[in-house]
């Protein structure tokens, strides 16, 4: 009997679950898991995770005491909720969980460093080694600078909202543990910009972007791991078979599992040495110049930060409302 695509993918790529839904993680048994503000907000609204939300709120109230305002308690709980989900996820998976720093700090190097240290302290207080946590930070220049400091402290980072080679090179040159180049969001931009309704997987601009980044890293010997993210269909995933890691939503994991057929390896470090690309050094000037020249990366990075900020604000409101309900009961 032929193997399904998911089983074959696992042979050449580390499969990661892109979700805060603990039941989905139990079902697909990925090595690692990634969360973001939108995914945590979605999970926090699922009835089966109400206990996690309530326990986090009660813990925040206990820490701050009866004199703290509801807004202060909700704010403290908000800081802890992603870690609460992360701790549950780490009970299921063998590897690492990615927990995101507040997206509103995306252009604040010091603020990002402080928030990342706080997140790691919370995990360590719960008995989890920092080796099992990746701190997710938006790949702005300020975010990359923050991650470089954190990596020197032994705090591993996952640079997200990555849409261009300039962001990827800056991460590699700063010794970042892992990057999450986005595939589907790049496709979205090109479809909207060109009016073209579809792209074959091998022509997909998001696939081509990750392929370029992967080959650049392997050709020039960078250790930073490449984890393709943000997929719109399984064709994008199968075109990136062989990538170091791919983080995939449960619906697409299910589709891969239900699909049989041959899955050839597409990305291979042995072939990268012949990839036609020159080495580029990226400092702040080069980064800003390349970013300004890349309209897609500029627009998608801003849109991504705004989207995560909106999800954070929604979560803060949800927590404040839930706290009011709990304390009125």
From Swiss-Prot:
Name the reaction it catalyses.
D-sedoheptulose 7-phosphate + D-glyceraldehyde 3-phosphate = D-erythrose 4-phosphate + beta-D-fructose 6-phosphate
Q: Which family does it belong to?
A: Belongs to the transaldolase family. Type 1 subfamily.
- A Pfam family cross-referenced in the UniProt record is TAL_FSA
Descriptive protein name: Transaldolase
Which NCBIfam families did the record assign? PRK12309.1 (NF008965), talAB (TIGR00874)
Q: In which pathway does it act?
A: Carbohydrate degradation; pentose phosphate pathway; D-glyceraldehyde 3-phosphate and beta-D-fructose 6-phosphate from D-ribose 5-phosphate and D-xylulose 5-phosphate (non-oxidative stage): step 2/3
Tell me the organism.
Methylococcus capsulatus (strain ATCC 33009 / NCIMB 11132 / Bath)
Q: What class of enzyme is it?
A: transferase
Principal location listed in the UniProt entry:
cytoplasm
Its biological purpose: Transaldolase is important for the balance of metabolites in the pentose-phosphate pathway.
The EC number(s) this enzyme carries: 2.2.1.2
Per its UniProt record, what SUPFAM superfamilies does this chain match? Aldolase
The beginning of the lineage is: Bacteria, Pseudomonadati, Pseudomonadota, Gammaproteobacteria, Methylococcales
Query: Which terms are listed as keywords in the entry?
Result: Cytoplasm, Pentose shunt, Schiff base, Transferase
Sorted alphabetically, the Gene Ontology cellular component annotations on this record are: cytoplasm
Q: Can you state the subunit structure given in the record?
A: Homodimer.
Q: Which domain of life is it from?
A: Bacteria
Task: Report the GO molecular function annotations.
Answer: transaldolase activity
Q: Which GO terms describe its biological process?
A: carbohydrate metabolic process; pentose-phosphate shunt
Where in the cell does this protein reside?
Cytoplasm
Keyword Transferase set for record: yes
Q: Which residues form the active site?
A: 136
């Amino acid at each position: 009997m032929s193997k399904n695509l998911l089983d074959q993918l696992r042979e050449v790529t580390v499969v990661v679950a892109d979700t805060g839904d603990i039941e989905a993680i139990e079902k697909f048994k990925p090595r690692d898991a990634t969360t973001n503000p939108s995914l945590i907000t979605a999970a926090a609204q699922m009835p089966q995770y109400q206990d996690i939300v309530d326990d986090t709120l009660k813990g925040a109230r206990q820490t701050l005491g009866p004199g703290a305002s509801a807004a202060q308690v909700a704010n403290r709980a908000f800081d802890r909720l992603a870690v609460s989900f992360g701790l549950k996820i780490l009970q299921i998976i063998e590897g690492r969980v990615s927990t995101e720093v507040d997206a509103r700090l995306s252009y604040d190097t010091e603020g990002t460093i402080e928030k990342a240290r706080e997140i790691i302290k919370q995990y360590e207080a719960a008995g989890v080694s920092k080796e099992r946590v990746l701190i997710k930070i938006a790949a702005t220049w300020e975010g990359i600078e923050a991650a470089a400091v954190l990596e020197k402290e032994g705090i591993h980072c996952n640079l997200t909202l990555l849409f261009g080679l300039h962001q990827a090179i800056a991460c590699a040159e700063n010794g970042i543990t892992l990057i999450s180049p986005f595939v589907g969001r790049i496709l979205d931009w090109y479809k909207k910009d060109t009016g073209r309704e579809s792209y074959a997987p091998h022509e997909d601009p998001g696939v081509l972007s990750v392929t370029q980044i992967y080959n650049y890293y392997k050709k020039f010997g960078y250790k930073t791991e490449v984890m393709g993210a943000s997929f719109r269909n399984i064709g994008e995933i199968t075109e990136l078979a062989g990538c170091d890691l791919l983080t995939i939503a449960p619906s697409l994991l299910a589709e891969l599992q239900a699909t049989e057929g041959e899955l050839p390896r597409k990305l291979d470090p042995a072939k990268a040495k012949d990839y036609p690309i020159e080495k580029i050094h990226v400092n702040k000037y080069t980064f800003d110049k390349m970013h300004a020249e890349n309209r897609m990366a500029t627009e998608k990075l801003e849109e991504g930060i705004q989207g995560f900020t909106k999800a954070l604000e929604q979560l803060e409101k949800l927590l404040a409302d839930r706290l009011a309900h709990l304390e009125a009961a």
